[in-house]
Amino acid sequence: MVWTLLGVLANQIAAPESLNLTPQQRFFMVSVPILFGGIFRLALGLLVDRIGARPTGILAQLVVIAGLAAAWIIGLKNYEATLLMGMVLGVAGASFAVALPQAGRWYPPHMQGLVMGLAGAGNIGVVIDALLAPRLAAAYGWPAVFGFAIIPAVAVLAIYIIVSKEPPVKITPKKFGDYFRLFGEKDVHWFCFFYTVTFGGFVGLAYSLGMYFKDRFNLTPQQAGDLVALCTAIGALGRPLGGGISDRIGGIKSLHIYYSVACLALIAGGLIESLALNVAAFFIACGAFGMGNGSVFQLLPQRFGKELGLMTGLVGCGGGLGGFLLANMMGQSRQHTGSYLAGLFVFASLCILALIGLNFVKRRWRTTWGAVAAARI
């Protein structure tokens, strides 16, 4: 949940009485944790395959707790400090590179969609952040929120140390060069792109919608946070649902549906003037992206089961890049046109490109590795 703190606190951090940031600075600030969450997934994915998921998870959580303590005690006194904090929070976002292979390796192929979706439903922390952080900031000041965040971070670390176990599947440690070997396979490029759109869409909206709703409809930070919580809840809960549906009808067919729905919802969100209908459009978009995340990770273990740690890092890096792009496109659009429309339309066009990509690969996937997979693709 701490991964999204800068996003849900952005309205207070960027306020004239605080750091007085421009729209472009605001959206770049919130995109930094997304970008570094993707980059650090590469490192954590490599560590998972070399030293195991459990020690990697413990190490990552200790880094995050140290960063939260520094932000609380020392403070974030300028724009540059928020960017450094965003890099640290990226480690929290990279935790998916630990959780997904650690969970997935306990279960058979035909259950991967549901299992990976449930593991990825940790996105529900975004909802908790959006509901609580703006209210805590209003009551105690936004710097204090980083101190409050230490409490659940320490609690999660303690629970993880007590109950987590390494999966029974033994994985041969990979070298960093294996990333480059894998990246030479064209299917890796496709998975990275598909996840760039689904996860990038979800997390980009999770970080950006608070500022979007406040700017466009003149809401308070608390009101905007409530709407972000509503929209992101369906995305977080939709991930296991999307994975489960993909187990039944196949990930390729599912992604066709989710990309189409997300594209239309983003366009509608950019055009509709009514607050209620606007929220409904982004609720649908977040739900489609969340379910799409589950579908991508239903397919991934079928194709790259033995390299799941590495692939989780690579694909997660693509997802982080997508969120970074969406947040910055919205910021650039707002800065230079006074509207968010252009940024939303550009990302909607990526959904269309993803649909074209699916049509390009589906026959080959179904007749090659999909034909021998132990689950529907």
What is each stretch, according to the model?
Residues 6-11, 186-240:
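Extracytoplasmic gate region of multi-pass secondary transporters
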Residues 31-45, 229-241:
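Central cavity-lining transmembrane alpha-helices of secondary-active solute carriers
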Residues 54-57, 255:
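Primarily marks hydrophobic transmembrane alpha-helices of the MFS/SLC 12-helix fold
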Residues 62-76, 261-273:
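C-terminal ends and interior cores of transmembrane alpha-helices
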Residues 118-164:
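Helix-loop-helix hairpin linking two adjacent transmembrane segments in secondary transporters
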Residues 144-161, 342-360:
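Symmetry-related core transmembrane helices of the 12-TM Major Facilitator Superfamily/SLC fold
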Residues 249-296:
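C-terminal transmembrane helical hairpin of 12-TM major facilitator-type secondary transporters
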